[in-house]
């Protein structure tokens, strides 16, 4: 199998995992669940899940554990995109060629989608068939990577810099925190 074919297989596997671990749109609250599914199952490069599966392949990791880790990291990534698109942040109206979550639904629903995806990510991760010590380490690492020391902190730097020029060090710090933290966990903690 070529690398491109393998990446496509991982993307498809991730799509199926997200579909499996997200609440069904038919369950209450239906609008929230439909919006979560809209945000997560609307395409994307799935770079972080590819890195999870690559690291897992090298380590000989359990397939279900990889699926859960990949889905959890992707849920956190998607929640960050949903929040990033909000009018109070970047005010984007398109994501992956489709209306953003707050445009397709509404701002309040989009905010709740981000919140729900973050907690769903941790709920998905803790059910992985792994040793409890490994799960605790994964949860700790994902929390740090997505919090003030990682993705959220990078977004705060980005927002504070609106209308200002960042120097090279500040720009690198913002990108390492905002983007690099989840990529790092994706390849390092399987």
Model-derived regions, located:
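Non-catalytic interface/linker regions that flank or bridge core catalytic/transmembrane domains
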Residues: 1-3
